[in-house]
Amino acid sequence: MVLPELLVILAEWVLYRLLAKSCYRAARKLRGYGFQLKNLLSLSKTQSLHNNSQHHLHNHHQQNHPNQTLQDSLDPLFPSLTKYQELLLDKNRACSVSSDHYRDTFFCDIDGVLLRQHSSKHFHTFFPYFMLVAFEGGSIIRAILLLLSCSFLWTLQQETKLRVLSFITFSGLRVKDMDNVSRSVLPKFFLENLNIQVYDIWARTEYSKVVFTSLPQVLVERFLREHLNADDVIGTKLQEIKVMGRKFYTGLASGSGFVLKHKSAEDYFFDSKKKPALGIGSSSSPQDHIFISICKEAYFWNEEESMSKNNALPRERYPKPLIFHDGRLAFLPTPLATLAMFIWLPIGFLLAVFRISVGVFLPYHVANFLASMSGVRITFKTHNLNNGRPEKGNSGVLYVCNHRTLLDPVFLTTSLGKPLTAVTYSLSKFSEFIAPLKTVSLKRDRKKDGEAMQRLLSKGDLVVCPEGTTCREPYLLRFSPLFAELTEDIVPVAVDARVSMFYGTTASGLKCLDPIFFLMNPRPVYCLEILKKLPKEMTCAGGKSSFEVANFIQGELARVLGFECTNLTRRDKYLVLAGNEGIVR
């Protein structure tokens, strides 16, 4: 009984492969030579006059222009997205898109349409985002296994590639860890790789927006709903199991398996008995030719035509400001970039140990020289010729910095060439041990912290970061006004840090590794600019309130750095990135 069943399964598999290949070839021909049925007669009459054609707007354009040129009669089945963008430039048409068909449906895929493609055709185009989940939500071992899969991914079909990537990435991964990655890591990379031309249409229209994708739904749904305001997301659901009260992914698709976009779209719109108003597909995907054929208006995003264009969405046009994000990787982990990172890891670790040792054991001027020789670039500029020395000799200078990384006070003290004391909060024991300057922990108690900082100022110079936490993006968080009540000898310091491989901050990871990850970068950059000492009339001694002083310094630092001021706090950051208030018990 087993042998006949195996033969039947084998026969079905062979038949499926034959049909799949034949359908794929047919779709490729349809892509290159497809034309509208009603143009067949004109095609036979005019073939000798015109051998090539350009895309046109489609049936709506034909009805408004009955006297079409011969070139229009040869148009392919679906025009390019460029044609649709030209159509949107018509003011009347734009109005009709936003009102006449209100709550009609616009649908597309995120892979290769809403997001620009970066990966080679030999690998799945979504590989970098699977790698982000594997590295940030899983472990370095999982990330290495995912990278090793590239050695055979090129031999597989797209659906099989997706199954392999999903299994390696999600098998045994905690649901909680995936939630953290989708909330705090992926949105940054998705926003940076949004396709501006497709997004223009997405943002302009008031259609109900639905995304159909074969990708795991957990990978893209949060971003599409929270950042792009998608009304619905139809993707592949992954199996979950519960072990000891914790949920894990099995890495396998649940239900009917991986989503087929065209079939899911047909099922989705079957009950409404109404075709979707607009669909956009990828010209390089044969499946998309079928996928968008059910729309009233269908357009293709042509990657080949846009390779020379800059299709990245500018930061100022993000649907929501990108202020907070987490994770260690500072680059999009394509296969080659990920391979380069793993090759660099042992070298970078040894380099970080060397840089830390130099800062701890050697004099400031020697440490600066050797750090520069090892690739650390420090830009230092001061507007205080006397380094902000107080007019009265009975207290120290209070240096007020914006907060980019844990190493802000370290680079400031080495650049000034004199010892400073730094006040910190939630600093790890390891970071305290390797710090080349004195650190004092605060208790988050206003009265006690104020008294402690006053005592430290009476003994020497002090550096404080009133934001209370780091921020990677060009924004300044709200400054705590406590520092303004301590002294009138206040010197603002503008700080910026840039990395190319690893971020030296984290909200949900191990904070003790922050300085190591930062110093593992091949060429980290630190920029410090010491501003002029705050005039007495702008301090509390001159009649200003502590809030006015804090806001003034925040504004000055933002002006120098080209950053934007916000009213956000440490609590806001940790609620977004870690789901807690950032309080250390």
UniProtKB/Swiss-Prot annotation:
Catalytic reaction equation(s) = sn-glycerol 3-phosphate + an acyl-CoA = a 1-acyl-sn-glycero-3-phosphate + CoA
Superkingdom is: Eukaryota
Subcellular location field: Membrane; Mitochondrion
Q: What are the TM regions of this chain, as residue ranges?
A: 126-146, 334-354, 356-376
Per the Swiss-Prot or TrEMBL annotation, the motif HXXXXD motif is positioned at 403-408
**Enzyme Commission number:** 2.3.1.15
**Effect of loss of the gene:** Plants display a massive pollen development arrest due to a perturbed degeneration of the tapetum, which is associated with altered endoplasmic reticulum profiles and reduced secretion. Defects correlate with several fatty acid composition changes in flower tissues and seeds. However, no significant change in seed oil content is observed.
Q: Name one GO cellular component term.
A: membrane
Q: Where is the signal peptide?
A: none
Q: In which pathway does it act?
A: Phospholipid metabolism; CDP-diacylglycerol biosynthesis; CDP-diacylglycerol from sn-glycerol 3-phosphate: step 1/3
Topologically, how does it sit relative to the membrane? Multi-pass membrane protein
Which GO biological process entries does UniProt record here?
CDP-diacylglycerol biosynthetic process; pollen sperm cell differentiation
Give the EC class as a word: transferase
Q: Which Pfam families match?
A: Acyltransferase (PF01553), HAD_RAM2_N (PF23270)
Q: Name one GO molecular function term.
A: glycerol-3-phosphate 2-O-acyltransferase activity
| This protein's UniProt keywords | Acyltransferase, Lipid biosynthesis, Lipid metabolism, Membrane, Mitochondrion, Phospholipid biosynthesis, Phospholipid metabolism, Transferase, Transmembrane, Transmembrane helix
Swiss-Prot/TrEMBL domain comment: The HXXXXD motif is essential for acyltransferase activity and may constitute the binding site for the phosphate moiety of the glycerol-3-phosphate.
Protein family: Belongs to the GPAT/DAPAT family.
Q: What does this protein do?
A: Esterifies acyl-group from acyl-ACP to the sn-1 position of glycerol-3-phosphate, an essential step in glycerolipid biosynthesis. Involved in pollen development, by being required for tapetum differentiation and male fertility. In addition to the sporophytic effect, it also exerts a gametophytic effect on pollen performance.
Protein name per the record: Glycerol-3-phosphate acyltransferase 1
> Could you tell me which species this protein originates from?
Arabidopsis thaliana
Q: Its gene?
A: GPAT1
